[in-house]
């Protein structure tokens, strides 16, 4: 996951949480709903990127182990 992807997903999560809170305080159900959606989207994007990072780490570990066995 690139740094910009991490920043964007965290930003979506934070902005969404703020919108959700403001929508709740102002009784603006559309803003609250949009905020909840944006926050959830940011969380999902973060989890997807975390899985990609772990898969990439696993790939490197398997490759290192295979290289060690060849050696």
Swiss-Prot record:
Residues 20-46 are annotated as: Disordered. InterPro entries: CsbD, YjbJ_sf. Belongs to the UPF0337 (CsbD) family. This is UPF0337 protein PPA1427. It comes from Cutibacterium acnes (strain DSM 16379 / KPA171202) (Propionibacterium acnes).
């Amino acid at each position: 996951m690139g740094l910009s992807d991490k920043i964007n997903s965290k930003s979506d999560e934070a902005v969404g949480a703020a919108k959700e809170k403001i929508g709740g305080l102002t009784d603006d159900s559309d803003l609250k709903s949009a905020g909840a959606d944006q926050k959830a989207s940011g969380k999902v994007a973060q989890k997807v990127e975390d899985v990609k990072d772990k898969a990439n780490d696993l790939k490197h570990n398997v490759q290192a182990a295979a290289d060690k066995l060849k050696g």
